[in-house]
């Protein structure tokens, strides 16, 4: 496959340096991914909530055909047996392509085989063959990429997948009517393993997986910085300390025992010790931050005994470069832990896990600490790869005054599951109450600048000093509020708390704005945003400057409402 210009430059050099570092350490760590794409402008159910229907099969065929053309391989198109989930009347489609690794040429059969060819079983994994599939999931089509032996080949494969999706009219992201950007609606999982199950680094170095689990648990940025909108216990990838307390305590015991046994740990023992504990609150092994279903799972046959570990707390990246950077990050963490597995005990985060680590500022700090640690242990990420990890949208609001900068950014919110957990096991998605939003208020002050006050809907935001950046102080607060009234949902009678009125009192002045969730003038939007530029304009239009002198005076919230430091408007009188 001929490399396109987007893979040139500093990024490619850093990717090659990364591969050279792992080769020098004799670490063989293959990479897999399952990028998901959607029809961004469509409001049809198969591109929102349903797995199949409409044009999804047609678009899946277009995507696979375009990807095989991008790769330039002599693939054989295969109509394979797809998965069938509880409650579904028939298996989902599975569009496959099979070829010999390292070969080049044109497809050996017609793409029509994907419609009228014989129905074949999915082939068993083989190190000399590549197997690529396109399958449906709710709202998206998923591309299951063949494993790559190094980051450079993963870069080529990822960029080809994104180009093919664009050719097929599919997108890795969506925009809501109000301009909010989100991912495709599917996941962006990364899988690591070896060329064969026996050569998996998780079996060759049995201490690696326990060390990875400790490392991730001690660095919440790895759980949240790249996650989707739904995080926490009801998400697709909850942390071990977000589930049942007893399981987390037992995980500490299992990790101690595995590490004490060192190289004597067998694949059976490794999987058997961890699989019952790496699950969500209902015991679902698929919904876990670190998924070991295909590590050494005899219940799934050969496909479950593959030596693979999947990292699931990852949203679909907007660009192939970001996907490659995330893969490089987790690959580097594994490489660091192969030779230096001691990272310390599991941490008791308590309420800080869903308070402090909900805020972008702390996640950025922790992620930088991870990168510093990797560099200290000889597996650094270059500046271009690192920059991809910190890519983010502009703040919702930014205001400047002499010696001061005020920014408001979206923060994470941990949406609760509705009803009995077990009763939702047959659904394609969990039913949560997503009506609560959290914002980070960040005030950066030059030396000697008075703090002033920030008010939200008449209540003072509990700004706390959290860091010094050179001569500057950084103060943070969080605000939680109900954005809309869901049905079904929690807290009947609690109305939507918007628009949010923001007032900044600084050096005797009051600057105000109203932050709307929808068009300030009301009424429907004509259609979805055409592109990222129009989406950004709609977001800007929802923040309306107002005369600060007309807004109510700021008063402190009652004791018990401001915690860690969060102002929860849902717990305050609605009249401000």
How would you label these PLM feature ranges?
Residues 1-184, 195-576:
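C-terminal accessory/tail domains of diverse enzymes
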């Amino acid at each position: 496959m001929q490399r396109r210009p987007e893979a040139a430059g500093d990024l490619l050099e850093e990717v090659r340096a990364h591969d050279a570092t792992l080769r020098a350490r004799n670490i063989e760590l293959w990479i897999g991914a399952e990028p998901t794409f959607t029809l961004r402008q469509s409001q049809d159910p198969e591109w929102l909530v349903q797995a199949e229907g409409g044009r999804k099969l047609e678009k899946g065929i277009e995507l696979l055909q375009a990807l095989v053309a991008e790769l330039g391989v002599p693939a054989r198109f295969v109509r394979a047996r797809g998965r069938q989930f509880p409650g579904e009347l028939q298996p989902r489609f599975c569009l496959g392509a099979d070829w010999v690794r390292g070969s080049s040429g044109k497809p050996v059969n017609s793409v029509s085989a994907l419609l009228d060819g014989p129905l074949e079983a999915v082939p068993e994994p083989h190190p000399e063959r590549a197997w690529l599939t396109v399958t449906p999931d709710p709202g998206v089509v998923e591309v299951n990429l063949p494993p790559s032996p190094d980051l450079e080949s993963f870069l080529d494969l990822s960029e080809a997948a994104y180009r093919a999706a664009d050719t097929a009219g599919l997108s890795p992201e969506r925009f809501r009517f109000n301009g909010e950007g989100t991912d495709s609606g599917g996941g962006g999982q990364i899988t690591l393993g070896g060329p064969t199950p026996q050569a998996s680094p998780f079996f060759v170095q049995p201490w690696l997986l326990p060390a990875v689990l400790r490392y991730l648990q001690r660095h919440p940025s790895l759980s949240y910085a790249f996650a989707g909108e739904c995080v926490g216990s009801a998400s697709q990838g909850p942390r071990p300390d977000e589930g049942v307390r007893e399981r987390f305590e037992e995980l500490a015991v299992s990790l101690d025992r595995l590490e004490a046994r060192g190289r004597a740990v067998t694949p059976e023992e490794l999987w058997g010790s961890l699989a019952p504990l790496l699950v969500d609150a209902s015991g679902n092994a698929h919904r876990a931050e670190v998924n070991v279903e295909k590590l050494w799972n005899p219940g799934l046959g050969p496909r479950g005994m593959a030596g693979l570990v999947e990292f699931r707390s990852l949203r679909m990246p907007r660009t192939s470069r970001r996907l490659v950077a995330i893969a490089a990050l987790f690959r580097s963490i594994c490489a660091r832990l192969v030779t230096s597995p001691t990272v310390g005990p599991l941490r008791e985060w308590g309420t800080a896990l869903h308070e402090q680590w909900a805020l972008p500022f702390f996640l950025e700090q922790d992620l930088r600490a991870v990168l510093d640690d990797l560099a200290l242990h000889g597996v650094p990420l270059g500046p271009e790869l690192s920059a991809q990890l910190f890519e983010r949208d502009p703040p919702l609001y930014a205001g400047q005054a002499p010696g001061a900068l005020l920014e408001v950014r979206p923060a994470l919110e941990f949406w609760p599951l509705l009803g009995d957990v077990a009763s939702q096991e047959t659904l394609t998605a969990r039913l949560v109450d997503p009506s609560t939003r959290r914002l980070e208020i960040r005030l950066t002050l030059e030396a000697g600048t008075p703090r002033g006050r920030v008010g939200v809907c008449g209540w003072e935001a509990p700004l706390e000093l959290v860091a010094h950046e050179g001569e500057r102080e950084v103060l943070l607060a969080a605000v939680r509020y109900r954005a809309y009234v869901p049905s079904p949902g929690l807290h009947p009678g609690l109305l939507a708390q918007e628009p949010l009125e923001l007032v900044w009192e600084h050096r005797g002045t009051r600057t105000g704005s109203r932050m709307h969730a929808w068009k300030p003038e009301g009424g429907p939007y004509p259609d979805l945003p055409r592109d990222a530029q129009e989406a950004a304009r709609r977001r800007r239009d929802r923040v309306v400057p107002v005369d600060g002198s007309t807004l109510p005076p700021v008063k402190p919230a009652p004791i018990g409402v401001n915690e860690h430091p969060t102002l929860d408007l849902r717990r305050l009188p609605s009249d401000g």
